[in-house]
Amino acid sequence: MGAQKSIHAGRAKIDVNVDFTHKLCTSLMFPAFRDTSSPLSLVIGSLCIKHPNLFGGSEKLDVSWDKGLYDSNVLVAFRRPRPEWRPQQCFFIQHSLSPEIGVHGTPVDNFSRSGSGGVNLSKLALGLDLSEPASSKWSSTTSIKFEHVRPINDDGRAITRDLDGFPITCSGNTHDSMVVLKQESRFAKATDQGLSHFSMQIEQGIPVVSKWLIFNRFKFVASKGVRFGPAFLLASLTGGSIVGDMAPYQAFAIGGLGSVRGYGEGAVGSGRSCLVANTELALPLNKMTEGTIFLDCGTDLGSSRLVPGNPSMRQGKPGFGYGFGYGLRFKSPLGHLQVDYAINAFNQKTLYFGVTNLASST
């Protein structure tokens, strides 16, 4: 369900890629944000245009556009060639619009799904990424960006308060602005016996203007995989915290795929801090099929009361939750099919379905 075309413009070749499957398959794994009768309402079409030699000096221009029924994302990135021993530069400008579900969404069906809270975020960002040359198994990226965040309701009108009358922005105005300096370091190692992965992100809000947000936020992800004969055990720990100025939408949202399965997005809680642990054991059933059992748990470490307006408490989120279950992974030349069956702490059952890596036609 994709198409790719190369167009020759002078000496340059422009690659155009249209994809209706990647986002679609991701969205099928999530319950609908709003009252929709089919997960197909979350289909997102992707258009990507790449120019590998914009000014004749190997400058690269990438333009991507993702558009769905409720959200959209436009990204323009420009890269200049530099010696391999110097940091690689990428100038970017990005605009996105999406429902804010993790913090302002309302949990339903024993916290297994999250409905719309009537808050959407329109974000405009522009900045510079500097990727350091990889050293051994370590790599790092430094970026600085200006970000403008404007909350809007489902009708597209700017808002300053949520449905309960509490402020959405940190400034109290219809928007928040900030300059953010970000440093990310990554370690990755893979062998026949297993894998190790660690990443650390640190973000610092810079006080360029007095009303702009000043904060420090960090997040880490540590994963370890070990092979026991045909079985493979993967465990990961994710955590983070934020201090300083903060808008509610900046809180860590706990719950959902990639967090605690069996819960809706952010249905476990949302706080200034978080800690999430995931464990999954995979066993091959045959050449094409793999079975898994998993256990997820997460907590806001009692920090939800420190989020302005305490949206987690107002929505009755527990602040701690766990989910367990089993799943199947099917591999084929056309793509990978994933099915997960999860049960949360309230004995509510949720079925996740997804397809990835579909073959594209040219």
Swiss-Prot record:
Signal peptide span: none
Gene coding for it: P39
GO molecular function terms listed in the Swiss-Prot or TrEMBL record: channel activity
The organism is Arabidopsis thaliana (Mouse-ear cress)
Q: Which PANTHER family match?
A: OUTER ENVELOPE PROTEIN 36, CHLOROPLASTIC-RELATED, SORTING AND ASSEMBLY MACHINERY SAMM50 PROTEIN FAMILY MEMBER
Q: Give the top-rank taxon of the lineage listed in the UniProt record for this protein.
A: Eukaryota
Q: Does the keyword Disulfide bond apply?
A: no
Gene disruption phenotype = Stunted growth, pale-green leaves, altered plastid structures in leaves, altered photosynthesis activity, and reduced accumulation of starch in leaf chloroplasts.
As for family, the record states:
Belongs to the OEP80 (TC 1.B.33.2) family.
Cellular localization per UniProt: Plastid, Chloroplast outer membrane
Q: Which UniProt keywords apply?
A: Chloroplast, Growth regulation, Membrane, Plastid, Plastid outer membrane
Is Membrane set as a keyword in this record? yes
- Name under which the protein is recorded: Outer envelope protein 39, chloroplastic
